Regions:
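Bacterial N-terminal signal peptides
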Residues: 12-23
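Generic helix N-cap/helix-start motif at coil->alpha-helix transitions
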Residues: 29-37, 49, 61-68, 81, ...
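Structural motif corresponding to the intra-repeat A-B loop/turn of tetratricopeptide repeats
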Residues: 47, 76, 80, 109, ...
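Inward-facing hydrophobic residues that define packing positions of alpha-helical scaffold repeats
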Residues: 53-57, 86-90, 119-123, 149-156, ...
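Alpha-helical adaptor scaffolds
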Residues: 73-75, 90-91, 103-108, 281-294, ...
């Protein structure tokens, strides 16, 4: 239709749209130029000494990340910064993360100087524990009397080790009697129970005389139980001494249950235990004898006094009975679970499975039907047992252009997305977290969807998975990113693309720069040694660990490694997943001990909690990704061949199960009309 025959309103809209479109290339070019100049200017301010960043930053004043240039200069030169310098910056960038960074850096400098008057003038509530304690010091310096419950207890009861900045505050509380010996002992014993020896030692240092000696003994017993408790037969039979032995033995059982058991045989009759002390030791021995599947594990668990039982001991009673194939004992152990535990789909599914083993299928069927309403590992397995479709009920996020525009223009999010575009992901995540703290729930949902649509998948995955209201947004929670690449590489490695996707999702949640404490890198969390070996054997380019942050290379190496892992276990994806997480040596030990178990029972008896949950998570994710790609999903039970049975990856022609939404039809998550979004910051 020619433009001149359009209605007047439509012609006006068309003209505006055309004008916007005509400016887009120039705007994109200008933003691209700004990004390059920002990189150069940011590199200059990060050097020692800083380069001529102002010349490089000319014309960047309206660029979202510009305040970071000034903030970096101020923070690096904070010892020479004047109050006027700081106030000028804070005034021009109010409420922003750069403003917060500069303020907190200046507060640390003022605390270092002991300038508590200035500190109080610049103070704003902070999440930083050092600064929280510095603020309490500033209040003390001003002559304020602190209230322990309101001011100090939130810091004191935090189980993490307290920073040195808190020492003067705690010393003052000890001096005025508000930090009592009882409070010190409570913190010390809580830390000892958690194995936090640093916090326990810090608490012990506040005591004196016999209390200090007793506290030091507890810290030593928890830190090095073998060496410390070797002398325990010569210790006096006193309450705090018994505490030291009990806490030490509980810790020792975690490390070496056999040696702890031998020591308990010597010390059990040596001291006059109270019930709490004795139960602590008995519980630890029973649980950790169970995690190693010791022959006496079941007897120890059954001998526990009711007051010595906890959720962990009750769960291990189920696993030990399950591993032994004692179905009646397993059912009795399931009956002994707490009311809250019995609501968990894991234990409801296992109850139904054990009932089938006892030929009580009529009792099992309604339990399977109930569990099958969940889109989870046990829910999918339950659906297979009663031959029902999977309960996958997808939702979509309703569009609201006005709210979306407001969210997209929110200045903190604008900086987050700009950092993401530049590939500066740690900085992007800091801005993202800062921005999300300001938004209400509906606005957060739209922000996460915006991140998804901009290819920042991990933000959507983390947010929607943590929010019960949005866990059915499967498109955002299970992105089909790099689809052509993942499918090609997985097929080339002889594995199911849905399984490869599930491993990526479980390992990194699509955080391309993920780097674990175990030194694993990237989407599929590859160790540098594994990556180097795979690259050499597959003739792929690899020079350094940071190369693994390249998602395409990571997938190429990871799928090949996963394929080789599967080959070691007859193609079995569930066993290969266990080895991918825990290593081949532990899986070998478990197979030697329990290879005759059904796959679902074997998974439940995996000793490592992380691996046990990881395998179930990967298998459930495989179903969801298969459904996302094909509209149907290979039965989960088909992905779980018995140990020793050969398994072949499914093809497009492999029969798959349908999905249903039994409770309701697919729904839409509607935006809240009351959604509030902080306004964009004024231009500078």
């Amino acid at each position: 239709m020619p433009i001149d025959v359009l209605p007047r309103g439509a012609r006006r809209l068309f003209a505006v749209a055309l004008a916007v479109l005509l400016t887009l290339p120039a705007a994109a070019q200008d933003r691209g130029s700004q990004r390059e100049r920002f990189r150069s200017a940011y590199a200059a301010v990060s050097r020692t000494p800083p380069g001529d960043w102002k010349k490089l930053a000319t014309g960047l004043e309206d660029y979202p990340l510009y305040p970071y240039l000034e903030a970096t200069v101020l923070r690096r030169g904070i010892t020479k910064a004047t109050r006027a310098d700081i106030e000028s910056f804070l005034t021009r960038w109010p409420g922003s993360l750069p403003e917060n960074d500069v303020r907190e850096t200046y507060l640390r400098e003022l605390a270092r100087r002991g300038d508590w008057t200035q500190f109080r003038a610049f103070w704003k509530s902070s999440r930083d524990r050092d600064l929280q304690c510095d603020n309490l010091r500033a209040r003390l310096a001003a002559g304020e009397k602190l209230d322990f419950a309101a001011d100090i207890d939130p810091i004191w009861t935090n189980p993490r080790t307290l920073p040195a900045a808190c020492d003067p505050v705690l010393a003052a509380a000890r001096g005025n009697g508000s930090l009592t010996d009882a409070r010190v002992w409570n913190r010390l014993l809580d830390a000892a129970a958690a194995g936090n020896t640093e916090s326990a030692a810090a608490a012990a240092s506040m005591l004196s005389g016999p209390d200090r000696e007793a506290a030091d003994r507890i810290v030593a017993a928890v830190s090095n139980p073998a060496a410390t408790l070797a002398k325990a037969e010569q210790w006096p039979d006193e309450p705090r001494v018994r505490d030291a032995v009990a806490y030490g033995l509980a810790r020792y059982a975690r490390r070496d249950s056999t040696s702890a058991e031998t020591l308990w045989a010597k010390l059990g009759s040596r001291f006059k235990w109270d019930d709490a002390q004795k139960n602590r030791v008995l519980n630890a021995l029973a649980v950790y004898r169970s995690t190693s599947y010791s022959p006496d594990a079941l007897a120890r668990l059954k001998a526990l006094p009711p007051e010595a039982e906890d959720d962990a001991s009750r769960e291990w009673h189920v696993r030990i009975a399950l591993a032994g194939g004692d179905w009646k004992e397993t059912l009795a152990a399931l009956d002994d679970l707490s009311a809250l535990q019995q609501k968990d789909s894991r234990w409801r599914y296992l109850r139904a499975r054990v009932l089938t083993k006892l030929d009580r299928k009529n009792e099992a069927a309604p339990i399977f039907a109930d569990v099958a309403h969940e889109a989870s590992f046990h829910g999918f397995l339950a659906a297979d047992w009663i031959d029902e479709p999977y309960a996958i009920c997808p939702r979509t996020l309703a569009a609201d252009p006005a709210v979306e525009k407001a969210v997209a223009s929110q200045s903190d999010l604008a900086r987050a997305f700009e950092f993401q575009t530049l590939g500066m992901l740690p900085e992007a995540r800091r801005e993202w977290d800062f921005a999300m703290r300001k938004l209400d729930d509906p606005a957060k949902r739209l922000a996460a969807d915006l991140a998804y649509r901009r290819g920042w998948y991990d933000r959507a995955v983390f947010f929607y998975s943590a929010d019960p209201e949005t866990q059915r947004l499967y498109e955002q929670r299970f992105p089909l990113a790099l689809e052509t690449h993942v499918k090609r590489e997985a097929s080339g490695a002889g594995i199911d693309p849905a399984w490869a996707y599930a491993i990526i999702r479980a390992e990194s949640a699509w955080m391309t720069d993920a780097h674990s404490h175990a030194d694993a890198y990237g989407l599929m969390q590859l160790l540098p040694g594994v990556a180097k070996h795979m690259a050499q054997s597959e003739k792929l380019p690899y020079n350094r660990p940071s190369d693994l942050f390249d998602p395409t290379l990571n997938v190429e190496l990871g799928t090949r490694y996963l394929g080789r892992m599967a080959d070691r276990y007859d193609g079995s994806p569930w066993l290969a997943s266990a080895a991918y997480n825990a290593g081949e040596a532990p899986v070998g030990r478990w197979l030697d001990a329990r290879a005759t178990l059904d796959p679902d029972f074997f998974i439940e008896t995996i000793p490592y909690k992380e691996t046990r949950e990881y395998v179930g998570r990967v298998l459930a994710f495989s179903v969801i990704y298969d459904w996302r790609m094909n509209g149907k999903a290979l039965a989960l039970s088909a992905r779980m061949p018995r140990i020793g049975q050969a398994y072949a990856a499914p093809s497009d022609a492999t029969p798959r199960k349908g999905v249903v939404c039994p409770a309701e039809t697919a729904a839409t998550v509607a935006p809240d009309p009351s959604t509030t979004v902080p306004p964009a910051a004024p231009a500078h």
